[in-house]
Amino acid sequence: MRTRRPRPAGPTRRPGAATGRCDRAPTGVAAEDHWLDFTVPAGLMPDARFDGRPARLQVHRVRPVYARGKCAGGPTRAAVLVHGRRVSGPAQFDVRHPAPGGGDLSLQTSLARAGIDTLAPSLLGYGLSTRFQDGLDDPGNASLRPYEADGSCTHPEGCDRTHNPVFPLDQQGSLLLTNPLGGERIAHSSSARFARTDVWVRDIRQVVDDAVARAKPTGGKVTLIGYSLGGVHVARALYAGNTMVPGAADTLRKVNRVVFMSSLFGFPTEEVTPPAGFATFPLTLNTRPSPTRLPQPRDQACTGRVVPGAADTLWDRILAQDPIGRDWGGTEPGNPTGLNRTPTFSTYGWNADVAGRLTPPTLVIHGLDDIDPAAPPTNATAIYDALPATMTNKALVHVACATHELLLEGCTGARCLPQAATVYGGRPGVPWAGPQATVKAALAEWIKSGTFNGAATGRFLVDESGVAEPVG
């Protein structure tokens, strides 16, 4: 099964881009989805009911197009982008909303226009990938009311516990009671967390293999990019000591560079069961998000950070990837508001010891104003400091006026046009288009050359005007 959505070529051809009967630079981009089939390995998912089940992964590919064919001799580059906890790959990395300064907010489109083939999977339990009828498709698998203090349960449908506040209790009562439950909580068909980190490690390795086969990058290597929780998954996928899902050495041979963007950090190397146990339900639900509000005076200083309408476009994109969840929620029967379904899971595999064993050149990029409690800016510093001293290409980049939603953030006003410098990734006299533009430029440079602002190694700050300077 395959859908194709070609995009118009647009004004991407530059003088000298065409040579004879071939193109040196892309003349456009094309987007398409494809699916990767697999069988769930025994013992990988927390609930054994899913062992041996057939499943598939959705992969959203945005690739460069060369109208006359690509000229021979130049390198072919590809990247795999791994999403975070709440948003699937296509919704996270291909937001088609107007960006400040022109173009759109889509990271995948920007990289494709730079000649980079991009593949963004929806990991198991996300987007249009398999969620299982008796897994995340069952509204009865959302959380129930908590157990009593003495451990008893007085509710006939059952009770729940959770190990992480991002998986709240009684979402059947708070979000689903009207649509679709019709006024009555129901018992679970699965009573365990949906996944553990290694479930998605398996996914990532399959997608890396697929990217190498489809994109045919030079040297048979791709750049692996992890955003937010995706950083944890990427790190674990490259960890040679992983015994639950062996095969890191083969994946490492196919990865030339790594990026950790707004990454979570500081988890035990292996899975540790909490004293009260893990969550006893597989499904958690998210309502429509609002743009992050920074505390004053940062909010006043970061003019134009919130791009008008971008959050609405993102939500529409999320629901388009969730045909079941979009019919859930709300308090008026038959008039659902839509909910974003995501899995519960246990997290491990990303800490200073694991970072110290990484071998691919590594870019760490993070918003300096990230107020997500799980992903403070200090995470980026800790990751960078833990990377091997022998790593020849490694860069740390903090971006001012950027939060955890830096892929959607812009800039307006006088601050965006520095008087005595040029915006990183831009041209003299052209205003900064915000953190989203910095991320696009930084990733394109890293994927192509393993440098940031021309340097192979170092710490950098991109200031409130988009100017990059070395730090320390």
Positions of PLM-derived features:
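N-terminal cap/lid segment of alpha/beta-hydrolase-fold proteins
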Residues: 16-74
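Short, surface-exposed "cap/lid" segments of acyl-processing enzymes
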Residues: 66-120, 126, 130-151, 156
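Alpha/beta-hydrolase active-site loop
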Residues: 139-214
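Alpha/beta-hydrolase-fold enzymes
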Residues: 223-338
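Active-site nucleophile elbow and catalytic-triad environment of alpha/beta-hydrolase enzymes
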Residues: 334-354
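Short beta-strand/loop motif that positions the catalytic acidic residue
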Residues: 358, 364-366
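Catalytic histidine-centered segment of alpha/beta-hydrolase-like enzymes
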Residues: 402-434
